[in-house]
Amino acid sequence: MVILISYFCFLLVFFLFTLILFIGFNRIRLI
């Protein structure tokens, strides 16, 4: 159970990091 929660948290952090990186890349490309 704890492993499942830690895995879900890791997946959520990875998704947020990828989303921020993608938005930042698009913003830099637009300028």
Curated annotation (Swiss-Prot):
Its main location: plastid. It is found in: Plastid, Chloroplast thylakoid membrane. It comes from the Eukaryota. GO terms for biological process: photosynthesis. One of its GO terms (molecular function) is electron transporter, transferring electrons within cytochrome b6/f complex of photosystem II activity. The chain crosses the membrane at residues 3-23. The keyword Thylakoid applies. GO terms for cellular component: chloroplast thylakoid membrane; cytochrome b6f complex. Pfam families: PetL. InterPro entries: Cyt_b6/f_cplx_su6. It is a single-pass membrane protein. Keywords: Chloroplast, Electron transport, Membrane, Photosynthesis, Plastid, Thylakoid, Transmembrane, Transmembrane helix, Transport. The 4 large subunits of the cytochrome b6-f complex are cytochrome b6, subunit IV (17 kDa polypeptide, PetD), cytochrome f and the Rieske protein, while the 4 small subunits are PetG, PetL, PetM and PetN. The complex functions as a dimer. Belongs to the PetL family. Component of the cytochrome b6-f complex, which mediates electron transfer between photosystem II (PSII) and photosystem I (PSI), cyclic electron flow around PSI, and state transitions. PetL is important for photoautotrophic growth as well as for electron transfer efficiency and stability of the cytochrome b6-f complex. This is Cytochrome b6-f complex subunit 6.
